[in-house]
Amino acid sequence: FSKQFLVHLIFIFHLLNAPEAKRCYSSSCGGRNVNVRFPFWLFPKHSSSCGHAGFNLLCTDRHETALKLPNSKPFLVREIDYEKQRIRLNDPNNCLAKRLVSFDASESPFSPLHLVNYTILSCHKEDIKPSSPYKPIHCLGNSTSSFFATRSDLASSMPSSCQIFKTLLLPVSSPLSVDLNDQEDLWLKWDSPNCRDCESNRSLCGFKDKTTLEIKW
């Protein structure tokens, strides 16, 4: 069996055994927080049958909405655009650039809006002028060196004393961003389940019944 088939099989099992007491209503972590509804479900306010596999959210101790991706620490959820099927994430430790360097969403239903080649460089602090347009990744480096992340086509403008640490494709919200530090938030998208028509018509989207993953609207 394929991995995707097994995931769907396990999810259908959860649908069949989900308690009926928890109805599938929109919910949030409190206050003016993110509104959570299908295909997302909010633990523990919703049962798993209220949402799609991989779309489970949770509330932090500070009553903020969070998304836990496979092989990753939780991201804070700042916004969900249900019609465009996009979610805006932020790092709770205010160091998104560090998270992006090792970001991997391949085992989740989400994918980046854009992938851009970035070069990570290690530079001696005394070689970087205060007027430099590049900002160090503040949560990396040490007392003598700083790490920078710039688009690979612009890496040659960095001081020649800087050492290339690695070059890799990184997820960004805008392909025009020069410095990875410009990314205050990370937008991801999802293609399945497709509820765009449902959302544009202001209709409710969800499963047709508890024995299928087919979507109704």
Regions found by a protein language model. Give the residues of each.
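Extracellular/lumenal glycoprotein segments
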Residues: S2-W217
